[in-house]
Amino acid sequence: MTDDSTVSERSDVGVGAVISREQSGSRAWWLVAGLLIIAFLARAPLYLSVFPPFEGWDEYQHLGYIAYLDQTSTIPVFSTATRVPLAIRPLVIAMPHSRWGGDQVRDWGALSYGDFWNAPAPTAATDRGSFSSPRLYQAQHPPLAYALDVPIWHALKRKHPLGAIYAIRTMNLLLAAIGLVLFAGALERLMPVFAPRVAVFALVCLHPLFFQNVARVANDALALATGIAGISLLVLADRRTLLTQGLMAAACIAASIWSKQTGLTLIPVLVLGLPLIGWADGVPAGRLCRVTAIAALVLLLLVAPLWLWSYRHYGAIITTQESLQLAADGPVAGKLLSSLEHLRWPPLIDTLFVPGRPWVGGWSFLPMQKSLADLYGWYWRILLAAAAVGGVVAMLRRWRPVEPVVSVPRVLSQAAAGLAVCAAAVIFTVLGLIHHAVVSNAVFGQSMTNPWYFMTALPFLFVLLARGLEAINSRLATVAVGGLAALFVAIDLHGTWVEMPRAYASTTDAALQWSRLASIHPAILSGDLRWLFLVTQLGALVLVVAGLVYASRSARDTTAQ
């Protein structure tokens, strides 16, 4: 009796120690993850104090969509008759523009950066009948993200229209941060080892283009946040929550589709990922089929109104301007085959994937500093090659014959299924980019596909990268991925602090740069506060390091107990 009692007590102590370590590790993870999300948001003051209004890609078009909804309370139809509302003209011509954006609103009186700083800004007093309004080509997009922005624009458009732009930009950053919270939860399952997990999350939070893509007036932030949330909810599903998580994932993916058509690439991720996650957790086949069918049906019901509206107005459910133009020009198959044959693949791969562009200087398309760009190119290629080798090694280990009695732990099966979901997200997003490149090449004679279209899948690519490196060595994965995150910080700071002010202010005089930038920003983002903004950004990174030190000490103390 005494021996049995002693064994039971020891067992309880052992189980309690394991639970204590798990709880301590989870607390440490959420501390560091929270600090990294704060570091993500802490980049906003400096970046937004530099980034001019309408320098975001197609930003005046996206604001025009919002103003159209505000004026008419109807969804704009993509056609030659749908024009950018004149309500935004006073704000547009009061600001300088990039060449790409300025050419479109030149008839309104808009000036380039160089002309703007050397000539008085035009006024809105010009007779409105003497010029035409640009076509609202962003009417190709679904309305959800813009509908969320309408209250901000409506409240501020009369007295603080410039403030409305920065309020919408800030809201978009907060939406992306919410998506990052769910991704942090999914990382606990995808990356069981703490250090590589932190390195992956740092990559995402510190990636320059991931931030730039959402720090503008556009529909990308909501599409990205809901897309990442949907995939993360799939990864977090288990036997008990499969249906609930599947339905929430379907709702998130539907919201992503209602925001931007890049969300269409996530439909197969849901249909394939949900049964895969359930199968890894031992869910019976019958229940897998039922849950997948229910989730797919809910997704269809949520998206059906958008597709019916699109089909009624365009005769199609994919309504990108390239697809509509291609269909209007006649037979499609021959043009697509010719486009596929003549598409310039090397520049496309270089721009989108290897090495890709981790930083893009707004609609002016400012290039990265050459040394940093070269270093990033070599570093990224080496990491991809090493991760590919590690992935092959991991698969060979998994396929190696083992004794029948040996079973794979449930947590490893769940992680493997989660990695398959990550791979599906990356693969189908890449296929979507290729489709867009082929179609746009057929219509315009060149690919119009941009690297920021990949941003929803980017976090899951980083997971695959780190797990491939982990298969070689866990410490190698942590150091290599952490080094890339540090390089991202250098690229981002140099671009924001050096490249952008010089280009947008059209001068090499540092004092004049910030003075000019202050004149086209709200007072709260004055260039006079730039040092405070820089300290805020760097201070957030210091807090992340302090959090890592604390987590490391906490882990050692827990292990010692």
Q: What residue spans do the PLM features occupy?
A:
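Interfacial juxtamembrane loops and adjacent helix segments
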Residues: Q71-I168, A327-G334, H342, F353-A373
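Transmembrane helical bundles and short interhelical boundary loops of multi-pass, membrane-embedded
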Residues: V291, K370-Y379, L476-Q561
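Membrane-interface transmembrane helices that cradle and orient dolichyl/undecaprenyl
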Residues: M191, G230-M248, S256, G278-A280
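Transmembrane-helix signature of polytopic, membrane-embedded enzymes
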Residues: K159-L162, F183-L206, T244, T478-V479
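Membrane-lumen/periplasm interface segments of multi-pass, membrane-embedded glycan/lipid transferases
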Residues: Y314-P404, R516-T536
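Perimembrane helix-loop-helix junctions
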Residues: S5, L233, R239, L266-L300, ...
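Transmembrane-helix motifs of polytopic, lipid-linked glycan transferases
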Residues: A167-M191, A229
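Membrane-interface alpha helices of multi-pass inner-membrane proteins
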Residues: Q245-Q261, L266-V269, L301
